[in-house]
Amino acid sequence: MDGRMFGLETPLMVALQHLLDVPDGDAGAGGDKAGGGGPTRTYVADARAMAVTPADVKELPGAYAFVVDMPGLGTGDIKVQVEDERVLVISGERRREEREDAKYLRMERRMGKFMRKFVLPDNADMDKISAVCRDGVLTVTVEKLPPPEPKKPKTIEVKVA
């Protein structure tokens, strides 16, 4: 159980939680790598991180804007795609810088994969999607299709019999 849910993020609780974390590569009971067959704490934490990647969705007069926090990521770490014709997928991975001459005394920044999916409205123009990442904030803009022209009523000629 994660003690942070109950406000138990004291130094002692944090230290105990780190002691309970078993690295993915270590063998668990019975020598299996999964540590008993259940999901690892890292997997669960990554899944939670994917679900809580902060995003704002705004409707503007001519477009929709999806604004997602991406601190520390470059354009090569972020992927923006459209799946199944109308599902916008924003994904990527934050990697830890590896240096052989450095020894971490504390590692608190979240590393790993993230993904968010958004169903686009019917009036979204799939051919006019752009993405810009500036100062750790990704903005994906999806332009709207022009509104359909109102149909003119069809006049039927009335014949006299």
Swiss-Prot record:
Domain sHSP: 46-161
Keywords: Cytoplasm, Stress response
Subcellular location: Cytoplasm
Keyword Cytoplasm included in the entry's annotation: yes
PROSITE patterns reported for this sequence: SHSP (PS01031)
InterPro entries, alphabetized: A-crystallin/Hsp20_dom (IPR002068), HSP20-like_chaperone (IPR008978), Small_HSP (IPR031107)
GO molecular function: unfolded protein binding
Source organism superkingdom: Eukaryota
Pfam families linked to this entry: HSP20
BP term (GO), one: protein folding
GO cellular component: cytoplasm
Chief location: cytoplasm
Family (UniProt): Belongs to the small heat shock protein (HSP20) family.
PANTHER family for this protein: HEAT-SHOCK PROTEIN 20 FAMILY MEMBER (PTHR11527)
UniProt-recorded name of the protein: 17.5 kDa class II heat shock protein
Lineage: Eukaryota, Viridiplantae, Streptophyta, Embryophyta, Tracheophyta
